[in-house]
A protein has these predicted regions:
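Juxtamembrane/interface segments at transmembrane-helix termini
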Residues: 35-45, 77-85, 89, 111-114, ...
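Membrane-interface interhelical loops and short amphipathic "cap" helices
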Residues: 34-57, 109-130, 179-200, 227, ...
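C-terminal hydrophobic structural anchor segments
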Residues: 284-287, 292-364
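Long, contiguous internal "core" modules enriched in hydrophobic/ aromatic residues
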Residues: 5-11, 22-28, 82-84, 122, ...
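Extramembrane terminal tails and long inter-domain/linker segments of multi-pass membrane proteins
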Residues: 1-29, 42-47, 123-124, 334-413
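Terminal, non-catalytic protein-protein interaction segments that mediate quaternary/complex assembly
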Residues: 12-65, 96-99, 103-107, 144-147, ...
């Protein structure tokens, strides 16, 4: 069969320069917000001694989880041998690197003392999942970069499958580690669950594929390159499966917690009387982020509409952000149960639901991390041969390991 031709985009249009300028401005604003919080102190944020992980952590965890899932498209093509996905492998790998870089940038800038990161990188407490995650995150970046090299270098193509298998296993471990950050926190009743690790893996598949779909559709629309309905339908059906899987894990998580009397308090808080957290859970996470996308993706007519597919992917991302917000911030807002069966009160807000309102600098820092991920992808498709010249239904291209011919780029972007 004819090999796939990969070409850089021209990147000479006004729209492309406007996109780069917008993303660059968001990054600059995010850096400014980080500087403001660093020099003014975290009292200018909505975070307190009760809620120490705020909105930046929501963005960071979302990007890190989505990074693992974004690589899933490459894994399906090279590791599991599904030919239609192979031309997408390069973009999948770059998006995974970009999302993880954006998430880690938010984390580092939100630490308060990012210069102290050197301590965490030189002195390890291997009883802490945070110490393990340093290796998992940096290892992921290195392995995926090598994986991308194997795919793009013709003489190294034969190694792409074994390296892809290593990347596949590594990303499962990485997402397990991210979920275990919360699963191992036994003091927080909203976190303490072994189900966190597999649920985060399912979340990564859903969030990552949703992000990949939006990037893919935007890239081919902006460059006027053919993108066939057949491939989009494959991807949207896969997204529907992942969304349903996440919904299943969420249901099992809450049902198992409701079975144990000790968790009735925190479950009642999240599901019934948690105010904004309850609203985010039912309206944004469940209705808008799960049920509505499933309806749009599997509707006989709407499911074939590109607008519906893009809307569904955007809703999945919105629901994912709400899910992580409820998990991270709602889990901290519910008071610690220090003495089970007893009522606790003190001047240190023991036994009181903590209040939290996202501040503008926190949101801007999070958006800066998202912009950083997107600008890496935008520059990547201009500098490297990541995008196939055609993904049309009639295209016989199926081999992602092929070198492009080096002809001038197609018009667009």
């Amino acid at each position: 069969m004819k090999k796939t031709e990969f070409l850089e985009i021209d990147g000479a249009s006004g729209g492309y320069y406007a996109l780069i300028a917008l993303l660059g401005a968001l990054i600059a604003i995010g850096l400014g917000a980080a500087y403001y919080m660093e020099h003014s102190g975290h009292h200018v944020t909505g975070m307190t001694n009760q809620i120490v992980w705020g909105t930046p952590h929501v963005f960071a965890v979302f990007l890190i989880v989505a990074a693992s899932g974004a690589l899933n498209v490459a894994s399906i093509g090279s590791v599991f041998g599904k030919t239609p996905y192979k031309p997408l492998s390069r973009l999948s790998a770059v998006l995974a690197i970009a999302l993880l870089a954006g998430g880690l940038a938010i984390l580092v800038l939100d630490l308060g003392r990012p210069d102290r990161l050197i301590v965490a990188m030189t002195y390890y407490n291997f009883k802490s999942i945070f110490a393990w995650n340093i290796f998992l995150y940096t290892g992921f970046l290195v392995i995926v970069a090598v994986y991308l090299w194997m795919m793009m270098e013709r003489r190294m193509n034969r190694y792409s499958r074994p390296v892809g298998l290593v990347a596949f296993i590594w990303r499962l471990i990485l997402t397990t580690g991210t979920g275990s950050i919360f699963g191992f926190l036994v003091a927080r009743q909203a976190y303490d669950a072994a189900l966190m690790a597999p649920m985060f893996i399912a979340m990564s598949f859903s969030f990552g594929l949703a992000a990949f779909l939006l990037v893919l559709m935007a890239s081919y629309r902006g460059t006027a390159r053919p993108l066939g309905d057949e491939l989009l339908i494959r991807l949207k059906n896969l997204l529907g499966v992942f969304v349903a899987t996440v919904l299943y894990f969420v249901m099992v998580y809450h049902l198992t917690n409701l079975y144990g009397t000790e968790h009735h308090g925190v479950q009642g808080f999240i599901l019934l009387d948690g105010g904004i957290y309850t609203q985010l859970f039912w309206i944004v996470q469940i209705l808008l982020g799960s049920l509505l996308p499933l309806f749009l993706l599997y509707h006989p007519r709407l499911g074939r509409s590109r607008a519906s597919i893009a809307t569904s992917a955007a809703l999945v991302i919105l629901g994912g952000l709400a899910q992580i917000y409820v998990l991270i911030i709602g889990g901290q807002a519910y008071p610690l149960v220090m003495f089970p069966g007893k009522e606790v009160s003190s001047s240190f807000f023991d036994g009181v639901v903590a209040s939290y309102s996202p501040s503008l600098p926190e949101v801007l820092l999070g958006l800066g991390g998202v912009a950083m991920a997107l600008i890496i992808v935008a520059l990547g498709i201009k500098i490297l041969r990541l995008l196939p010249l055609s993904l049309g239904d009639a295209s016989p291209s199926t081999d992602s390991g092929a070198e492009s011919s080096g002809e001038p780029s197609a018009a667009g972007a």
